[in-house]
């Protein structure tokens, strides 16, 4: 062992004898060579050929056998270091050196291809991860709802509010799109044009209102204003006609109450005085006048009731049992009864005035009386119709 030759170094400046005997891997922290494109060409010329590698491997094996070393794991002698840094055992290095194929150095195109494939793989991995995360989020919406609920947000209320706002905006757009029709004229333009043409012929005036439709619109608006004014006046007159008279239903004045009390007292005193005079014999009771006054009041009340009912027929129970006069010149039993029989049916009758609701003919006629143009014939015809 003392005469064993000194083992060459592996290119790092450290002798092979100083290194451990069983070293399987080389540290990856420090690359052995600079594999830039410029250095790769120089390295390819300096590396030995496969035949040289075989011969050196054979010499190293025979040298180890002569020295008495039977261990196959000793590093080869006089061999340049390889670029394969992941060597697990010397047996693997021997197999590699004994392989007929030479070292394959990377090329420029290979680097670009490798970079492109690595980028594509990374993108595919990111896309697959993102798609997986999105699918997981879509498949589990309860977690999102729980987070929103914990934050104080009600998803259903927000959705309802969003739908209501969308519907309101749609309805507003629809209302804005609705076209309001133009105001229709008060009178039909064709009828107005025919009437104007007729009046023009009567006045020897050639008029063609169809050429100027603005004239027809002006005449229609003028007629509308005229009719509106007449109807407004008629409504005011009808309200004044149907206005009720205020009746003083409250307490009367103190003067009228005092006068009424005095009149009642005087009447009672007069009746008491008459009774005293009859009792003393100073005055006799007039039975005829008493009967006459009672009969007169009874007939007058019957006539008033008949006039109130509006019937001309008199029933038997409404008349008194006293004999009626046979002629107008006959002597009647009472002054009032004779006056009523003398008047007969030619006398005045009581009737309540009927107040028609709304606008009637006399209201319109009274409204037209204030008009001075072309209303004389209408007023005369209206009053004639009311009289009939």
UniProtKB/Swiss-Prot annotation:
User: Could you tell me which InterPro entries the record lists for this protein?
Assistant: TAF4, TAF4_C
Q: Which GO terms describe its cellular component?
A: nucleus; transcription factor TFIID complex
Q: Which residues form the Histone-fold domain?
A: 193-261
Compositional bias (Basic and acidic residues) spans?
A: 106-126
Where it mainly occurs, coarsely classed, is nucleus
Query: According to the UniProt entry, which residue ranges have a biased composition of type Polar residues?
Result: 12-22, 43-64, 79-98
What GO MF annotations does this protein's record show? chromatin binding; DNA binding; RNA polymerase II-specific DNA-binding transcription factor binding
Location in the cell? Nucleus
Superkingdom assignment = Eukaryota
Q: Name one GO biological process term.
A: transcription initiation at RNA polymerase II promoter
Q: Cite the record's Low complexity compositional bias ranges.
A: 127-139
Residues with the modification Phosphoserine, per the entry, are: 36, 49, 80
Query: Positions of the region Disordered?
Result: 1-143
UniProt keywords, alphabetically: Coiled coil, Nucleus, Phosphoprotein, Transcription, Transcription regulation
Q: Which residues form a coiled coil?
A: 279-297
Q: Name one Pfam family in it.
A: TAF4
Q: Which family does it belong to?
A: Belongs to the TAF4 family.
Q: How does it assemble?
A: TAF4 heterodimerizes with TAF12, forming ultimately an octamer consisting of a TAF6/TAF9 heterotetramer core flanked by TAF4/TAF12 dimers on either side, similar to the histone H2A/H2B/H3/H4 octamer. The 1.2 MDa TFIID complex is composed of TATA binding protein (TBP) and the 14 TBP-associated factors. One copy of each TAF1, TAF2, TAF3, TAF7, TAF8, TAF11, TAF13, two copies of each TAF4, TAF5, TAF6, TAF9, TAF10, TAF12, and three copies of TAF14.
Q: What else is known?
A: Present with 1900 molecules/cell in log phase SD medium.
Q: What does this protein do?
A: Functions as a component of the DNA-binding general transcription factor complex TFIID. Binding of TFIID to a promoter (with or without TATA element) is the initial step in pre-initiation complex (PIC) formation. TFIID plays a key role in the regulation of gene expression by RNA polymerase II through different activities such as transcription activator interaction, core promoter recognition and selectivity, TFIIA and TFIIB interaction, chromatin modification (histone acetylation by TAF1), facilitation of DNA opening and initiation of transcription.
Could you tell me what this protein is called?
Transcription initiation factor TFIID subunit 4
What species is this protein from?
Answer: Saccharomyces cerevisiae (strain ATCC 204508 / S288c)
Gene behind this chain? TAF4
């Amino acid at each position: 062992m003392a005469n064993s030759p000194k083992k060459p170094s592996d290119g790092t400046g450290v002798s092979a004898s100083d290194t451990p005997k069983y070293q399987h891997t080389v540290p990856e922290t420090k690359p052995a060579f600079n594999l830039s494109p410029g250095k790769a060409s120089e390295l390819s010329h300096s590396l030995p050929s496969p035949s040289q590698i075989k011969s050196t491997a054979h010499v190293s094996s025979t040298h180890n056998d002569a020295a008495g070393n039977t261990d196959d794991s000793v590093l080869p002698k006089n061999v340049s270091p390889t670029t394969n840094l992941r060597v697990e055992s010397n047996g693997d290095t021997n197999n590699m050196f004994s392989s007929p194929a030479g070292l394959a150095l990377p090329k420029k195109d290979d680097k670009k291809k490798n970079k492109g494939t690595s980028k594509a793989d990374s993108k595919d991995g990111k896309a697959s991860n993102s798609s997986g995360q999105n699918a997981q989020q879509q498949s589990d919406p309860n977690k999102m709802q729980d987070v929103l609920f914990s934050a104080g947000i009600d998803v259903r209320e927000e959705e309802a509010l969003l739908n209501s706002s969308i519907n309101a905006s749609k309805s507003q757009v629809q209302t804005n799109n609705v076209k309001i029709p133009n105001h229709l004229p008060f009178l039909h333009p064709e009828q107005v044009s025919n009437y104007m043409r007729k009046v023009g012929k009567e006045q020897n005036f050639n008029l063609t209102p169809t050429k100027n439709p603005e004239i027809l619109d002006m005449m229609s608006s003028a007629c509308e204003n005229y009719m509106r004014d007449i109807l407004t006046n008629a409504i005011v007159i009808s309200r004044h006609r149907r206005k009720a008279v205020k009746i003083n239903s409250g307490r009367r004045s103190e003067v009228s109450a005092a006068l009424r009390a005095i009149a009642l007292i005087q009447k009672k005193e007069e009746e008491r005085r008459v009774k005293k005079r009859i009792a003393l014999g100073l005055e006799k009771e007039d039975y005829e006048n008493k009967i006459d006054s009672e009969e007169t009041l009874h007939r007058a009340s019957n006539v008033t009731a008949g006039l109130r009912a509006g019937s001309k027929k008199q029933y038997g129970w409404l008349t008194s049992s006293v004999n009626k006069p046979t002629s107008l010149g006959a002597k009647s039993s009472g002054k009032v009864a004779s006056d009523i029989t003398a008047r007969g049916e030619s006398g005045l009758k009581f009737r309540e005035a009927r107040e028609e609701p709304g606008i009637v003919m006399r209201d319109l006629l009274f409204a037209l009386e204030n008009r001075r143009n072309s209303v004389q014939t209408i007023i005369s015809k209206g009053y004639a119709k009311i009289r009939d």
